[in-house]
């Protein structure tokens, strides 16, 4: 693929390498380091003049440092005369701060959008934004890809009783997501209504739907401390579900999440690799990973060639 360069930030080099391999490319040379005062320094190690540049950096790990690193990499490529700079952000940082839900609350997702644009990004590729309206925070093109086709493929290949399952949303906000998956599998859906008083603390859960004598599959875009989905799993089991799975696009997994998952009644907690999971998997055999590198790689190929990416909304590329 001529006139294209792919660079990796520090957050998820394994995913970046998989994307490059699928495109038959080498990752571009870049050196990132910190000065003694903790300022980030980036050195692009090869010419990008006239190139179509893609920088892969996920919003995970040391989020603030990685975001700053991404901004500097974008700007470094832009002022080095790259023809176009696309930020490939599998898990978009600050996506949960997408609205003014109380007095004096910041809309930090909008701030991040502004920062990316000012740094010089011409295009954004991301996956399963926590709130789809974040696309409207940008004045540049944003392709919000979906993990749904890969999730459907995993369910059909790994859950033998998938025809006798119920797709469950752990909250009312995810109803659209689970109904889409349930419709494509031609199965029922349910949701759990939760009343929350404090952050990450669930006081009461009400199941709306039937899971008796069925496999229950909890689906959500992300999980952080996993308090909600672990309580939801208990609720589903007590309502008669035979087995419970959780499938999540972004496994943030912070705090005491490993012990919670190990002690929960899940058959498996399945996440995509928008965030690195290797260390977590060493301590929790229930965590399984769906590789989405082929989706991001195909989105990059289609973008570079001026083709539509809408095919990826319903298909997993080979």
Swiss-Prot record:
Record-linked PROSITE patterns: PRPP_SYNTHASE
Catalysis performed (reactions): D-ribose 5-phosphate + ATP = 5-phospho-alpha-D-ribose 1-diphosphate + AMP + H(+)
Gene Ontology MF: a single term: ribose phosphate diphosphokinase activity
Highest taxon, organism lineage: Eukaryota
Known regulation of activity: Activated by magnesium and inorganic phosphate.
GO biological process, one term: ribonucleoside monophosphate biosynthetic process
Residues binding ATP, per UniProt: 96-101, 130
Listed cofactors: Mg(2+)
EC number assigned by the record: 2.7.6.1
Pathway stated in the Swiss-Prot or TrEMBL entry: Metabolic intermediate biosynthesis; 5-phospho-alpha-D-ribose 1-diphosphate biosynthesis; 5-phospho-alpha-D-ribose 1-diphosphate from D-ribose 5-phosphate (route I): step 1/1
Family annotation (Pfam families): Pribosyl_synth, Pribosyltran_N
Cross-referenced Gene3D superfamilies: 3.40.50.2020
Primary enzyme class: transferase
Keywords from the named record: ATP-binding, Kinase, Magnesium, Metal-binding, Nucleotide biosynthesis, Nucleotide-binding, Transferase
One GO term describing the cellular component: ribose phosphate diphosphokinase complex
Region: Binding of phosphoribosylpyrophosphate, residue numbers: 212-227
Binding residue positions for Mg(2+): 128, 130, 139, 143
PANTHER family associated with the record: RIBOSE-PHOSPHATE DIPHOSPHOKINASE FAMILY MEMBER (PTHR10210), RIBOSE-PHOSPHATE PYROPHOSPHOKINASE 1 (PTHR10210:SF118)
Oligomeric and partner information: Homodimer. The active form is probably a hexamer composed of 3 homodimers.
Family, as annotated: Belongs to the ribose-phosphate pyrophosphokinase family.
Function, in words: Catalyzes the synthesis of phosphoribosylpyrophosphate (PRPP) that is essential for nucleotide synthesis.
Protein name: Ribose-phosphate pyrophosphokinase 1
Organism the protein comes from: Macaca fascicularis
Gene behind the chain: PRPS1
């Amino acid at each position: 693929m001529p006139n294209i360069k792919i660079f990796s930030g520090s957050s998820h080099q394994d995913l970046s390498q998989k994307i490059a391999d699928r495109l038959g490319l080498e990752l571009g040379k870049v050196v990132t380091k910190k000065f003694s005062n903790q300022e980030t320094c980036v050195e692009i190690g090869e010419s990008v003049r006239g190139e179509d540049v893609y920088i892969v950096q996920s919003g995970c790990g040391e989020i603030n440092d990685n975001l700053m690193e991404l901004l500097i990499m974008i700007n470094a490529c832009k002022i080095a005369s790259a023809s176009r700079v696309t930020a490939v952000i599998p898990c978009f940082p600050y996506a949960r701060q997408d609205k003014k839900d109380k007095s004096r609350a910041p809309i930090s997702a909008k701030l991040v959008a502004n920062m990316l644009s000012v740094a010089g990004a011409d295009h954004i590729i991301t996956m399963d934004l926590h709130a789809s309206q974040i696309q409207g925070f940008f004045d540049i093109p944003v392709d919000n890809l979906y993990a749904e086709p890969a999730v459907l493929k995993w369910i059909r290949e790994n859950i033998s009783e998938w025809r006798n399952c119920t797709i469950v949303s752990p909250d009312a906000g995810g109803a659209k997501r689970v109904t889409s998956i349930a419709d494509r599998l031609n199965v029922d859906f349910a949701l759990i209504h939760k009343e929350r008083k404090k952050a990450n603390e669930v006081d009461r859960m009400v199941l709306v739907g039937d899971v008796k004598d069925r496999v229950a599959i909890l689906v959500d875009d992300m999980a952080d401390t996993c308090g909600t989905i672990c309580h939801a799993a208990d609720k589903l089991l007590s309502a008669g579900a035979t087995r419970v799975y959780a499938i999540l696009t972004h496994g943030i997994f912070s705090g005491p999440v490993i012990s919670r998952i190990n002690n929960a009644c899940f058959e498996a907690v399945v996440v995509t690799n928008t965030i690195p999971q290797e260390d977590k998997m060493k301590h929790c055999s229930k965590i399984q990973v769906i590789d989405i590198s082929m989706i991001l790689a195909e989105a990059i190929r289609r973008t570079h060639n001026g083709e539509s990416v809408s095919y990826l909304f319903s298909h997993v590329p080979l």
